[in-house]
């Protein structure tokens, strides 16, 4: 009995770049080292890969003796006879490959698990490891494995092992094998009722069929088609899979993270299932990375997405029953990293139709109730998911049993024996356990290796890399060595929560096992435990990566959701209304809209769909409100202010129905509208639900003026007219878009960028100036302001993309920044004017300088070292300076040094009280080095009889492969800060520190302001006097003016502060630097007043912790927050200051519940102005400020770890 085989060289299927992973292994386990000889059929080889224009003939054969599911490090035998291939000329070459019982050692890396490989590398499809005993050796088998013993002429320079494929003989005339597999030919056409598909490549073969890569003719879509066997033994399970996929097709596949099935049809009596094409499965991803452990920040989004899928399946009463790395696919590793979907429902079943003693799941991920023959439910999927995340964390299967006995033995040794009540009920308990009755009380014990081998004849083998006595020991494996400070503490806390969740997922008793819904609420997933480290680079990276799993709704959702867009007009008596439907929005893309201003979105910034990497969306409906005064074809009334609002649901594509993996490119004019009435255009997300706020005990009079709004109207409509006097929720802006306006603004948020005006009177090519201002701290017990660090950023119009340059980057460079600011104001505009000590009131009835261009602000051309202290001065125009002093004299008894232009760089007049003290905070800098983590193994590894995989993952939190650029952080260097050593301070470059009041620009006043770097040695600042080695420079930062007119405009522009978890009721002083809280610089607007509400529309009172007193006739003050709880042990590093060098702040989702311990999330009142405040998530090289006047607000990077109310993030990348 000879065997027929075909040998596939390594370059076969080399062109494949992606695969739909639904191929499965046989349900066999080795009963001996050699299988019985079988007859196998011939099959076609992909002729294109051999250079043939047609598939070659069937070829020859040799015999294999391969132990299936062999453990790592064990040997196998192979007998070969001959390999026959057909060349391009048609001649046959017989390659003698005689090998008498060739003894081959299994590879140590890449072959540690007993996997069958059809393809190599990313081309290999995930194969099922259905590991069931080989009770019937005459049953049909398909064996595929990697071999590397073929002759040298079959080897290529790639060095990949050749793949050997075997299949049964006896092909029928209907192109179906004896086992029911359909024999495919390349470029064969598969026809459904609606579409035709051309076969491009073979992707893989499994238990229930095979998968091919196909092209949907007439389109540019590539799909994966699973062709089921027509064998009677697989017919019923195929029908179950089809019915489950039909049920899942009614759900949103992107929202619930499972593969989308398009259609099902019959082709020559074979059922064909059409799926979306996915990129790479997790096993191939691990293999590609040499099976290096993945960091927890990467495991978390994978866990969250798979748990979301399991939660949906559980709600539908479905069991996946084959969850493993091969069945978790990366959608697009390049465009959507760590975005995964669950595939392969070939083993799925309904929970009501489960049968005990059924072999389900791959053996490594098989739940104890399946092994013991207990009744089971959806909990088996949670066990599998626990094994998967443990494998991702270890880089190795947690329980890699070669036999079911080994599997339950590994589980029992690590987690203890199953409960007696489980063993008593299990139908297969006696296979692995024996009951002892000779003792005082009867009990179960695990059979010894000798007893099991004597009963079954199968010898147990050790295949574990790590032998754990407890799951708690998992936290001590692969420790990260390159973390320090708060990053190290955050990593340790993350590991503790990971192990806590893992233990709940791997509970032997299925009734006690955690559910998918509980998993999503676990601290490891929602990252509550990381809130104690808000300024840790590691935590920033965790939140940023976690945001990716929320990016699931995109333009492709229209295929599953037939929702009509809701269009709501602005409810205003002075504004016209417009109602349109989705068809009108579609025509909006193609028509050319004439504009009197620039379009909202510029062609230079590509916008991605909702599933983009940084797009944050969820099931919560979010909207886009476009508020132009007029749209083309609709005449605008010039006699009164006009505005329209168009609401588009997030499921409606804005430009094109592109696939999720394609970025959306919005052309100029798509959102362009015709302007009139000098109104402003805004892009504002409308929030449909808001976290309820606690009842207020103290009321600010200015908030009551805004009036109350119905909760139903919250976030639904915004009136955009000449006077911004409405109330608008302020979201946390996290996506890449910038809208510009040349309007002078005073802001206290972190990113401040003055963009290039669209046009200037002299048509000059102006440069832009950007300042990254770190927010200021407020001292609860004392009225002192602590300086945050800040850094300059160079914006040059000659460079296509500007970048925020940190002090580390600009070391040794000459930096010159010029800002051309065009001021603009409406007639009868009202503003507010104040200096750092006193507030005066005046009105500007006629602002005739609305179009007057401001003079440039020049930074002195001096070397900018890595550490520098910058003094803002205004000594270029003495006459104007004196004029300012004459207009604003301090009323306080103490002389204001800021007003006298003699302010020392380390002394600043308090923004809250004229009699407050002057202080600064010393600062250091911590910059984790982006070095690779060294290979580290645990002590338990010595107990393993298996070799370890070379190398470990490079999971540095600040390296080049981190989603965040390398960032530095200011560490508190007070005396009692234990975790910051003097050695660290000396060896790391210190960050430049300066006290920066609100930067205010005044209409009608033109001044040249010079900013000079005057310090080259950064030392801790000494309270009340200048530090040694520092130059004292006069500064007029406190001499700028604002206009204040009414009690409504005198509202305190306070940034709501979110407390850290664990902050205690203790007055801050110099010895408790880590306990101080952050207060934010209030913003000032020198244009039309636009007030934001604090909380919901009907929330007119401020919270108790926002209560404050006013002084000097209603001068705005900074209101501190009281502490609420005691600090944790990690607190000294948990409350370090943020670094100005952070290029991209952390993204967080509202569901992480980053708020007060009571769950309160506060609104951020921010003064709006038609001027650019770009999103902080914009990359250093992606910002091109060439947009017209628009109102936009960016969230502060100092809010990293704290979401702003409303609690939902924007779905759109440009919101």
UniProtKB/Swiss-Prot annotation:
Keywords recorded for this protein, A-Z: Apoptosis, ATP-binding, Cytoplasm, Isopeptide bond, Kinase, Nucleotide-binding, Nucleus, Phosphoprotein, Serine/threonine-protein kinase, Transcription, Transcription regulation, Transferase, Ubl conjugation
Main location: cytoplasm
Region annotation (Interaction with FAS) ranges: 796-891
Annotated region (Required for localization to nuclear speckles), positions in chain: 855-1011
Placement of covalent cross-link Glycyl lysine isopeptide (Lys-Gly) (interchain with G-Cter in SUMO): 1208
Annotated catalysed reactions: L-seryl-[protein] + ATP = O-phospho-L-seryl-[protein] + ADP + H(+); L-threonyl-[protein] + ATP = O-phospho-L-threonyl-[protein] + ADP + H(+)
Cellular compartments per GO CC: cytoplasm; cytosol; nuclear body; nucleus; plasma membrane; PML body
Positions that bind ATP: 203-211, 226
Gene Ontology BP term (one): protein phosphorylation
Compositional bias segments (type: Low complexity): 912-929
Region (Interaction with AR): 767-944
Tissue specificity of this protein: Overexpressed in multidrug resistant cells. Highly expressed in heart and skeletal muscle, and at lower levels in placenta, pancreas, brain, spleen, prostate, thymus, testis, small intestine, colon and leukocytes. Not found in liver and lung.
Cross-link (Glycyl lysine isopeptide (Lys-Gly) (interchain with G-Cter in SUMO2)): 27
Active site per UniProt: 322
Biased composition (Polar residues): 945-957
Span of domain Protein kinase: 197-525
Domain of life of the source: Eukaryota
Modification type Phosphotyrosine: residues: 359
Residue ranges, annotated region (SUMO interaction motifs (SIM)): 866-918
Record InterPro entries: Kinase-like_dom_sf, Prot_kinase_dom, Protein_kinase_ATP_BS, Ser/Thr_kinase_AS, Ser_Thr_dual-spec_kinase
Family, per entry: Belongs to the protein kinase superfamily. CMGC Ser/Thr protein kinase family. HIPK subfamily.
Self-association state and partner proteins as the record states: Interacts with Nkx1-2. Interacts with FAS and DAXX. Probably part of a complex consisting of HIPK3, FAS and FADD. Interacts with and stabilizes ligand-bound androgen receptor (AR). Interacts with UBL1/SUMO-1. Binds to NR5A1/SF1, SPEN/MINT and RUNX2.
Protein name: Homeodomain-interacting protein kinase 3
């Amino acid at each position: 009995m000879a065997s027929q085989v075909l040998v596939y060289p390594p370059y076969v299927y080399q062109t494949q770049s992606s695969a739909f992973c639904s191929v499965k292994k046989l349900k066999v386990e080795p009963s001996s080292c050699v299988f019985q000889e079988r007859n196998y059929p011939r099959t076609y080889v992909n002729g294109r890969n051999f250079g043939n224009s047609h598939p070659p003939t069937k070829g020859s054969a040799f015999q294999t003796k391969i132990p299936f599911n062999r453990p790592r490090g064990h040997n196998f035998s192979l007998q070969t006879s001959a390999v026959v291939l057909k060349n391009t000329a048609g001649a046959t070459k017989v390659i003698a490959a005689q090998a008498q019982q060739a003894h081959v050692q299994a590879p140590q890396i890449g072959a540690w698990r007993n996997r069958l490989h059809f393809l190599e590398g990313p081309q290999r499809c995930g194969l099922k490891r259905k590991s069931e005993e080989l009770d019937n050796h005459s049953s049909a088998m398909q064996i595929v494995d990697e071999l590397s013993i073929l002759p040298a002429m079959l080897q290529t320079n790639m060095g990949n092992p050749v793949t050997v494929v075997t299949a049964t003989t006896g092909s029928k005339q209907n192109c179906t094998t004896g086992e029911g597999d359909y024999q495919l030919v390349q470029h064969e056409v598969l026809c459904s009722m609606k579409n035709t598909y051309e076969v491009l490549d073979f992707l893989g073969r499994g238990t229930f069929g095979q998968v091919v890569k196909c092209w949907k003719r007439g389109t540019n879509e590539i799909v994966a088609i699973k062709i089921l066997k027509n064998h009677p033994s697989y017919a019923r399970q195929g029908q179950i899979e089809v019915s489950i996929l039909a049920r899942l097709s009614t759900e949103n596949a992107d929202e619930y993270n499972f593969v989308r099935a398009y259609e099902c049809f019959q082709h020559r009596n074979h059922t064909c299932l059409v799926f979306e094409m996915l990129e790479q499965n997790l096993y191939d991803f691990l293999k590609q990375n040499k099976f290096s452990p993945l960091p927890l920040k990467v495991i978390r989004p994978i866990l969250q997405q798979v748990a979301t899928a399991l939660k949906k399946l559980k709600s539908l009463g479905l069991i996946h029953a084959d969850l493993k790395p091969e069945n978790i696919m990366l959608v697009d590793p390049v465009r959507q990293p760590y975005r995964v979907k669950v595939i392969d429902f070939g083993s799925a079943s309904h929970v009501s139709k489960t049968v005990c003693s059924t072999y389900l799941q791959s053996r490594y991920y098989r739940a104890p109730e399946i092994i013991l023959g207990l009744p089971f439910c959806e909990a088996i999927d949670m066990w599998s998911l626990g094994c998967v995340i443990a494998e991702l964390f270890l880089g190795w299967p947690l329980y890699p049993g070669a036999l079911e006995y080994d599997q339950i033995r590994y589980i029992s040794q690590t987690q203890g024996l199953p409960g007696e009540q489980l063993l008593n009920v299990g139908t297969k308990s006696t296979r692995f356990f024996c009951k002892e009755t000779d003792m005082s009380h009867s009990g179960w014990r695990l059979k010894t290796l000798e007893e099991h081998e004597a009963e079954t004849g199968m010898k147990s083998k050790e295949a574990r890399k790590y032998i754990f006595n407890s799951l708690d020991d998992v936290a001590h494996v692969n420790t990260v060595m390159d973390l320090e400070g708060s990053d190290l503490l955050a990593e340790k806390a993350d590991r503790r929560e990971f192990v806590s969740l893992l233990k709940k997922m791997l509970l032997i008793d299925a009734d006690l096992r955690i559910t998918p819904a509980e998993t999503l609420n676990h601290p490891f997933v929602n990252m509550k435990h990381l809130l104690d480290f808000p300024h840790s680079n590691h935590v920033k990276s965790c939140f940023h990566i976690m945001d990716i799993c929320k990016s699931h709704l995109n333009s492709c959702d229209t295929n599953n959701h037939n929702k009509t867009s809701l269009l709501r007009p602005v409810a205003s008596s002075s504004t016209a209304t417009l109602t349109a439907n989705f068809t009108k929005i579609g025509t909006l893309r193609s028509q050319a809209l004439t504009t009197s201003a620039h379009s909202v979105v510029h062609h230079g910034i590509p916008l991605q769909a909702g599933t983009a990497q940084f797009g944050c969306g969820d099931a919560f409906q979010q909207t886009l409100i476009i508020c132009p005064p007029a749209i083309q074809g609709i005449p605008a009334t010039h006699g009164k202010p006009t505005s329209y609002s168009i609401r588009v649901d997030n499921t409606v594509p804005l430009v094109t129905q592109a696939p999720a993996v394609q970025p959306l490119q919005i052309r100029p004019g798509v959102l362009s509208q015709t302007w009139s009435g000098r109104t402003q255009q805004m892009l504002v997300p409308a929030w449909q639900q808001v976290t309820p706020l606690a009842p207020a005990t103290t009321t600010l009079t200015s908030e009551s003026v805004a009036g109350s709004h119905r909760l139903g109207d919250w976030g639904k409509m915004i009136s955009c007219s000449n006077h911004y006097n409405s109330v608008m929720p302020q979201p946390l802006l996290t996506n890449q878009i910038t809208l510009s306006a040349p309007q002078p603004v005073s802001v206290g948020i972190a990113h401040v960028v003055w963009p290039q005006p669209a046009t200037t009177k002299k048509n000059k090519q102006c440069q832009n100036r950007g300042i990254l201002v770190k927010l200021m701290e407020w001292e609860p017990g004392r009225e002192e302001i602590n300086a945050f660090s800040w850094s300059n950023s160079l914006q040059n119009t000659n460079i296509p993309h500007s970048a925020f340059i940190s002090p580390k980057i600009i070391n040794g460079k000459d930096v010159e920044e010029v800002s051309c600011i065009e001021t603009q104001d409406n007639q009868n505009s009202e503003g507010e004017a104040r200096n750092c000590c006193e507030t005066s009131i005046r009105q500007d009835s006629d602002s005739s300088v609305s179009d007057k261009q401001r003079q440039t602000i020049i930074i002195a051309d001096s070397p900018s070292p890595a550490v520098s202290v910058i003094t803002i001065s205004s000594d270029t125009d003495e006459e104007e300076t004196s004029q300012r002093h004459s207009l604003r004299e301090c009323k306080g008894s103490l002389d204001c040094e800021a007003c006298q232009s003699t302010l020392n760089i380390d002394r600043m007049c308090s923004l809250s009280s004229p009699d407050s003290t002057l202080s600064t905070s010393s600062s250091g800098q911590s910059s984790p080095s982006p070095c690779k983590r060294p290979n580290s193994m645990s002590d338990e590894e010595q107990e393993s009889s298996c070799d370890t995989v070379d190398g470990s993952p490079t999971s540095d939190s600040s390296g080049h492969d981190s989603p965040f650029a390398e960032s530095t952080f200011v560490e508190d260097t007070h005396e009692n800060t234990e975790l910051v050593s003097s050695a660290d301070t000396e060896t790391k470059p210190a960050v430049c520190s300066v006290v920066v009041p609100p930067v205010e620009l005044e209409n009608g006043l033109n001044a040249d302001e010079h900013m000079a770097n005057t310090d080259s040695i950064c030392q801790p600042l000494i309270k009340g006097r200048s530090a040694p080695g520092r130059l004292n420079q006069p500064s007029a930062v406190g001499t700028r003016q604002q206009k204040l007119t009414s009690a409504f405009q005198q509202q305190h522009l306070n940034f709501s502060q979110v407390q850290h978890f664990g902050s205690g009721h203790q007055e801050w002083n110099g010895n408790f630097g880590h306990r101080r809280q952050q207060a934010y610089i209030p913003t000032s607007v020198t244009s039309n007043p636009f007030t934001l509400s604090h909380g919901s529309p009907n929330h007119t009172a401020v919270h108790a912790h926002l209560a404050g007193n006013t002084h000097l006739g209603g001068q705005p003050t900074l209101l501190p927050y009281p502490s609420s709880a005691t600090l944790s042990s990690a607190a000294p590093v948990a409350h370090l200051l943020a670094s100005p060098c952070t290029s991209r702040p952390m993204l967080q989702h509202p569901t992480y519940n980053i708020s007060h311990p009571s769950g309160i999330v506060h609104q951020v009142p921010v003064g709006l102005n038609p001027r650019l405040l770009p999103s902080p998530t914009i990359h250093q090289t992606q910002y091109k400020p060439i947009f017209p006047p628009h109102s936009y607000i960016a969230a502060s990077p100092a809010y990293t770890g704290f979401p702003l109310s409303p609690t939902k993030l924007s779905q759109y990348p440009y919101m």
